[in-house]
C-alpha cells in the first residue's frame, strides 16, 4: 500500500511535468509580445 506522502509527491511531479512546457511557452510568448 502506498503512503499518502508518496502519492502527493507523484501527483506533484505529474503536475510539474504536464504544466512545465505550458508555462515555458506562455512566458516565451509573453516576453515576445512585450518586445
Swiss-Prot record:
Q: Does the keyword Nucleotidyltransferase apply?
A: no
Question: TM segments?
Answer: 6-26
- Main localisation: plastid
> Which Pfam families does the entry mention?
PSII_Ycf12
Gene Ontology CC terms, in alphabetical order: chloroplast thylakoid membrane; photosystem II
Query: What are the record keywords, sorted?
Result: Chloroplast, Membrane, Photosynthesis, Photosystem II, Plastid, Thylakoid, Transmembrane, Transmembrane helix
Annotated GO biological processes are: photosynthesis
What is the membrane topology listed in the Swiss-Prot or TrEMBL record? Single-pass membrane protein
Q: What pairs make up the disulfide bonds?
A: none
The listed locations are: Plastid, Chloroplast thylakoid membrane
InterPro entries under this entry? PSII_Ycf12_core-subunit (IPR010284)
The protein's assembly and partners:
PSII is composed of 1 copy each of membrane proteins PsbA, PsbB, PsbC, PsbD, PsbE, PsbF, PsbH, PsbI, PsbJ, PsbK, PsbL, PsbM, PsbT, PsbY, PsbZ, Psb30/Ycf12, peripheral proteins of the oxygen-evolving complex and a large number of cofactors. It forms dimeric complexes.
NCBIfam families listed in its UniProt record: PRK13686.1 (NF010239)
Q: What does this protein do?
A: A core subunit of photosystem II (PSII), probably helps stabilize the reaction center.
Q: Which family does it belong to?
A: Belongs to the Psb30/Ycf12 family.
Q: What is the name of the protein in this document?
A: Photosystem II reaction center protein Psb30
- Identify the species of origin: Cyanidium caldarium (Red alga)
Amino acid at each position: 500500500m502506498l503512503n499518502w506522502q508518496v502519492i502527493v509527491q507523484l501527483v506533484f511531479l505529474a503536475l510539474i511535468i504536464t504544466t512545465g512546457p505550458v508555462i515555458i511557452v506562455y512566458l516565451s510568448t509573453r516576453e515576445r509580445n512585450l518586445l
